[in-house]
């Protein structure tokens, strides 16, 4: 059995068609849990441009997925934390750029702050792949 993604006809369609409401992971799948990824460069510096910060956060998620031998199509759940509603377009643009046609179950949450006040985005992910 492969991973199944779907949207019930009895539930409102996903916002911007950017995700699926439901994902079923088969019992024989390897599951990867990715801690919240920030938009920090390898040297720990933070891009000052919000689009670059969002891109880097997504790039870090993808690096984790690929290191586990998986691809964007294997991402089954995203939870994103944003500190400013006005930054959502940056997040959405990067999401589209890095996920392409992948449509994992998703939640975006507006929070007062992350651990450091200058951080704008944090993205957690779960990926699964049949073995």
Residue ranges, per PLM feature:
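N-terminal presequence-like segments and the immediate start of the first folded domain
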Residues: 1-59, 63-76, 82-131
């Amino acid at each position: 059995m492969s991973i199944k993604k779907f949207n019930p006809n009895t539930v409102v369609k996903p916002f911007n068609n950017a995700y699926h409401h439901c994902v079923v992971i088969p019992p024989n799948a390897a599951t990867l849990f990715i801690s919240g990824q920030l938009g920090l460069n390898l040297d720990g510096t933070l891009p000052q441009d919000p689009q670059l910060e969002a891109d880097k956060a997504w790039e870090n998620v993808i690096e984790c997925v690929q290191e586990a031998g998986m691809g964007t199509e294997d991402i089954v759940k995203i939870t994103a934390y944003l500190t400013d509603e006005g930054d959502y377009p940056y997040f959405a643009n990067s999401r589209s750029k890095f996920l392409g046609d992948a449509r994992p179950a998703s939640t975006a949450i507006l929070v007062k702050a992350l651990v450091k006040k200058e951080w704008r985005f944090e993205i957690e992910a779960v990926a699964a792949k049949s073995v």
